[in-house]
């Protein structure tokens, strides 16, 4: 039997057969599985709901995610409690988290076999609403459940009240997620390997409210004055009843991403955010 370093689990972006990407993803998946075999790796597929056989998860060294950032976010959350690294092969639009393009996979796998790949470990969030617990890779968002009215969110740091946000909601982002929804809401970019939380209000009623960066050693709690929604990485939702507590802390397990040794964080920012480009090129 091959050792765990030679076993790769494969996640593929869930796509309906009528989606224009369905045929492309199906062909890419088949090509990836053949390539893994040619390069000496054992492989197995994970379905949309993850894996029911924990023996396969334990056997795998890492998980290949074929799709965009949404695919890898879902896979990272599924695998978080198993402490397994993931790497993304871009088949989506943005591809901020994905490590490589499809045509780079062969070289990436060869480097993986020879330990010429770097492992990045990022802070993840652990949230809890009463008996329900969950992980977030990018962010946890508290937002209005009803279309009308202002949501009041009381925020506490280590059980001490420090602010009340009045508006559409609040983003609690990881450094890795600071370039996602947080950035769209005019929150700050925090280096992806930092150990901190980013709190960014959504359309706050007060002009004095500003985003806040807190050290990850703090435990946070939030409650709202009316029923609200808690959204995890833009992919999962939970109900937060009026005056019910949402607790957030640093997860004891990190988010693990395999990346090329040549990947440079600031170069990625420059490319994805078009820094240094003229306004005509951006448009």
From Swiss-Prot:
One of its GO terms (molecular function) is NAD binding. NAD(+) binds at residues 69-70, 138-139, 166, 168, 176, 179-184, 235. It catalyses: NAD(+) + ATP = ADP + NADP(+) + H(+). Keywords: ATP-binding, Cytoplasm, Kinase, NAD, NADP, Nucleotide-binding, Transferase. It is found in: Cytoplasm. Its EC number is 2.7.1.23. Pfam families: NAD_kinase, NAD_kinase_C. InterPro entries: ATP-NAD_kinase_N, ATP-NAD_kinase_PpnK-typ_C, NAD/diacylglycerol_kinase_sf, NADK. Its cofactor is a divalent metal cation. Disulfide bonds: none annotated. GO terms for biological process: NAD metabolic process; NADP biosynthetic process. SUPFAM superfamilies: NAD kinase/diacylglycerol kinase-like (SSF111331). The active site is at 69 (proton acceptor). PANTHER family: NAD KINASE. This is NAD kinase. It comes from Helicobacter acinonychis (strain Sheeba). The lineage of its organism: Bacteria, Pseudomonadati, Campylobacterota, Epsilonproteobacteria, Campylobacterales.
């Amino acid at each position: 039997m091959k050792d765990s370093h030679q076993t790769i689990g494969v996640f593929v972006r869930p796509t309906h057969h009528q989606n224009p990407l369905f045929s492309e993803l199906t062909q890419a998946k088949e090509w990836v599985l053949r390539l893994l075999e040619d390069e000496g790796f054992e492989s197995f597929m994970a379905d949309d709901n993850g894996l029911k056989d924990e023996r396969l998860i334990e056997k795998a060294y890492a998980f290949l995610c074929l799709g965009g950032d949404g695919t890898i976010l879902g896979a990272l959350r599924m695998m978080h409690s198993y402490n397994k690294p993931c790497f993304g092969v871009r088949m989506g639009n943005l591809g901020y988290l994905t490590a490589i393009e499809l045509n780079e996979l062969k070289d990436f796998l060869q480097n993986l076999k020879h330990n010429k790949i770097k492992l990045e470990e990022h802070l993840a969030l652990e949230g809890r609403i009463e008996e329900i617990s969950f992980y977030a890779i990018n962010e946890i968002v508290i937002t209005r459940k009803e279309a009308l009215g202002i949501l009041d969110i009381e925020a506490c740091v280590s059980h001490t009240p420090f602010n009340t946000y009045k508006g559409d909601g609040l983003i609690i982002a990881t450094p890795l997620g600071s370039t996602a929804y947080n950035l769209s809401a005019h929150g700050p970019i925090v280096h992806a390997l930092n150990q901190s939380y980013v709190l960014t209000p959504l359309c706050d009623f007060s002009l004095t409210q500003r985003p806040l960066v807190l050290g990850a050693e703090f435990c946070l709690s939030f409650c709202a004055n009316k029923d609200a929604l808690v959204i995890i990485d833009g992919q999962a939702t939970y109900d937060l009843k009026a005056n019910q507590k949402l607790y957030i802390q640093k997860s004891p397990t990190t988010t693990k991403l395999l990346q090329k040794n040549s990947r440079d964080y600031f170069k990625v920012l420059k490319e994805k955010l078009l820094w240094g480009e003229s306004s005509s090129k951006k448009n």
